[in-house]
Amino acid sequence: MRFSPTFFLLSQLRLTRRRAATSSRFYAVSALNNPNNLSDSEQQQVNHLNLSKLTQHGLQRLLNSTRDDPNLALSFLRQLKEHGVSPNVNAYATLVRILTTWGLDIKLDSVLVELIKNEERGFTVMDLIEVIGEQAEEKKRSFVLIRVSGALVKAYVSLGMFDEATDVLFQSKRLDCVVDIKACNFLMNRMTEFGKIGMLMTLFKQLKQLGLCANEYTYAIVVKALCRKGNLEEAAMLLIENESVFGYKTFINGLCVTGETEKAVALILELIDRKYLAGDDLRAVLGMVVRGFCNEMKMKAAESVIIEMEEIGFGLDVYACLAVIDRYCKNMNLPEALGFLDKMLGKGLKVNCVIVSLILQCYCKMDMCLEALEKFKEFRDMNIFLDRVCYNVAFDALSKLGRVEEAFELLQEMKDRGIVPDVINYTTLIDGYCLQGKVVDALDLIDEMIGNGMSPDLITYNVLVSGLARNGHEEEVLEIYERMKAEGPKPNAVTNSVIIEGLCFARKVKEAEDFFSSLEQKCPENKASFVKGYCEAGLSKKAYKAFVRLEYPLRKSVYIKLFFSLCIEGYLEKAHDVLKKMSAYRVEPGRSMCGKMIGAFCKLNNVREAQVLFDTMVERGLIPDLFTYTIMIHTYCRLNELQKAESLFEDMKQRGIKPDVVTYTVLLDRYLKLDPEHHETCSVQGEVGKRKASEVLREFSAAGIGLDVVCYTVLIDRQCKMNNLEQAAELFDRMIDSGLEPDMVAYTTLISSYFRKGYIDMAVTLVTELSKKYNIPSESFEAAVKSAALKAKRFQYGE
C-alpha cells in the first residue's frame, strides 16, 4: 500500500504526540517548540520528516489537516522556518484563519507582529488579507476578515506603525469588510498616548467614510485627545453633541489634568443637579478633582473634597488620601503630610504600605533618617502590613546612619514575617556595607544571593564595584570588571562611571585616569564622571576646567556635585556659571541648588540677583523652601527693605510653608529696631514697628512655636535698650527655666547693660557664671571687669 508524502509527514507528527510520556494534551507542541524535550527516538522521527523537501502544495494540505489543532499548526510552521522553509502567503493565511477561528488572539497577535517585522516574507500584508478572504467559507468570511483586520491594526499599533494601521482600515473597507469599532478605538487611544492628535482627528472625521459608527468610547477618546491638546472648548462642544457618563468623566479628568480643576468642580455640580452623576461615577470624578487640586498645589481644597466625599457617604477614599500625602511628600512638606495622615487616621482611614513608604521616603529625602526609623517602628507596631519597599527604606536609613548591622537584623525580621527579600533589598544592604568599608560583608551578601538562587543584576554589580573603588580596592574592582565582561551582566557606561568616581573619591585619580584610557569605548558620560570625580578628590578647580570643556548636557547629579563643591570653596561666580549652563541646557536645577545660590547672593548683599533667581524658581514651579524664604526675608530686613520682606513673609504662608522661630525672630528683630527707644528712626516709624512687633509676637504665640536662644536674646536686647533691666533679667531667667542654655551673646547682652547702668555686682555675678560655664579662667575676665567697673563708677559719680 502506498502513502502520499503529506500523509506520511502528518502521521509522523501525530505519532510523536501519541508517544509522549505525559498525558498533557499539548506535549507535542512544547516538544516541537523545544527539541530538547524529545527523547532520542522522538527526535529521530522529527528529523525524518524531511521538511526542507516539502512542496508548497504538500505544506498547504498538511496545514489544512491541522485545522482542529491550532497549536500543532503553529508549531509545525515554526519547525518549517527552523528548517529553512519560507512559508508562502497561502500557508500564513491558513494559519491565521485557524488561529482566528479558534479565538487564540494572543497567539494571532504574536504571529502577525512577527510577520510584519519580517521584511523578506515575499508578500504584502494586504495580500495576506485578500488570500484569507478567498480561503474562508462564505458564511464565515466576514467574521474572519473582521477579526484578522482588527488584529492587524493592533499589531501595527504595538510596533508604533500608525500610518500602516490606518491603512488597514481603508483596505478592509475595499474588501467590503468593516473593522470592529473596538479596533479603531484602540488605534485612536494609542494615537492619543503618543501625542498624534492631528492624525487622530483626521481619522475621526473619516469614520463614516469607513462605514464605522462611533460609540461613547470613541467620543470619549477624542475628548481626551482634545483636552490634552488644550482645545477644551472643542472638547466641550463634542461632548454636548454626544452626551455620555463616560465622556463626561473623561472631560472632567481632562480639565483636572490641564489645571482647570475649578471648572471641573462647576461641571460636576451641574451634572449632580441634572442627576447625571451618582454612585461610583461621582466617586470617581471627585477622586480626579482631588488629584487635580494636588497638581495645582491647592492642598486645602483637595482636603476639603475628601471630607465632602466622606460626608456624602462615600467614606474615606484611600486613593484620594494617597494623592494628598504623595503631593505633600513630593513638596517635602512633611509636617502637613503627617498632620493630614493623623486626621484621616482619626476618621478611620486604613493605612496601607504605599502610604507608609511615601512617608518614610520623604523622611529620608529630607535627611531625617533617624526619624524615618522611628516612624517605621511606629507603623510596624500598629500592625500595618509593611512590604519589602517599606523595609528597604528602613535598610537605606540604617545604612546611611552607619548601622548596617541593624539593617541586616531587620532583613532577618523581614524573612521571619514571610517576606522574601528581592534583589533591591540585597543591593541596598550591599551598598550599606560598602559605605562602612565592610567590603567583605558585601561580598558575602553576593554569595548569599547566589546561594538562594537569585542572580545579582547590573545595578547590584555597579553598587559593588563602586563601593570597592571608593574604598581603594582597585585590583578587586578590575577583577570583577573583567568577570562581568566574560560572564555577565556586561558592564555599561554607568559601571565605568562609578569606577572612575569611586577611584577619585579614594584619591586614586591617576588610577581612574588610567582606567578611562583603557576603555575601548569612551562615552560622554564617562568624561562627565571626571567632573564629579575631581570634586570627590577635592579638586574643584580641575573639575570646573573639565566641565567647561564638555559642550553637551550632563547628568543632573554632575551639575549638583560641581555646584556645591564650588560653593564650599568660595568660587561663587563659577557656581553661578554652572546654574546658567544648566538653564541653557534646560536642566532643572532643583530647590536645593537654587536655595544655596540665593543664600550665597544674600551673604554678599546681592539681593537683586537673589530675587531674579527666586522668581525664576517660582516660574518653573519650584516652591522655595523655608530656608530660602527666611534668608531672603533676613536680607531684605538687613537692607531695611521691610515691604519686600513682608511681601515674602505673606507669600510663604499662602503657599502653605509655615514660618519657624528663625523666620519670626528675623522680622521681630527688625521691627523692634524701628522702636524709637532704639534711636534708629523717627517716632512714627517707631510706633509702626512697635505695633508690628506685637503682631509678630501674637502670631508667634498662636502658632505654638517655642522661643529659642536667639529670639530670647533679641527680646532681652530690646528691654536693655529701653532700660528695663528688670524685665530683661526676667526674660533671661525664663529662658533658663524653659530648658534653654544662654549662649555667649545672651550673657554679654545683659552683662554690658548691667555695667552701663552701674550694676557692678550683678554684672560680676554673670561674668563668674559665664566663666564657669565655658570653663574659661577667671583671670581672663578680671581686667575687663575691673575696667568696666571703673568706667561705671566714674560715670556714676560724674568723674
Curated annotation (Swiss-Prot):
Q: Enumerate the subcellular locations listed in this protein's record, separating them with semicolons.
A: Mitochondrion
Q: Which GO terms describe its cellular component?
A: mitochondrion
Which Pfam families does the UniProt entry name for this protein? PPR, PPR_1, PPR_2
Coiled-coil ranges (or none): none
> Which PROSITE patterns does the entry link to?
PPR
Q: Does the keyword Transit peptide apply?
A: yes
Q: Which Gene3D superfamilies match?
A: Tetratricopeptide repeat domain
The annotated transit peptide is positioned at 1-27
- Where does this protein chiefly localize? mitochondrion
Q: Where are the PPR repeats?
A: 145-179, 180-214, 215-250, 251-278, 282-316, 317-351, 352-386, 387-421, 422-456, 457-491, 492-522, 523-553, 555-589, 590-624, 625-659, 660-695, 708-742, 743-777
Which domain of life does this protein belong to?
Eukaryota
UniProt KW keywords: Mitochondrion, Repeat, Transit peptide
* Assigned protein family: Belongs to the PPR family. P subfamily.
Record's protein name: Pentatricopeptide repeat-containing protein At2g26790, mitochondrial
Which species is this UniProt entry from?
A: Arabidopsis thaliana (Mouse-ear cress)
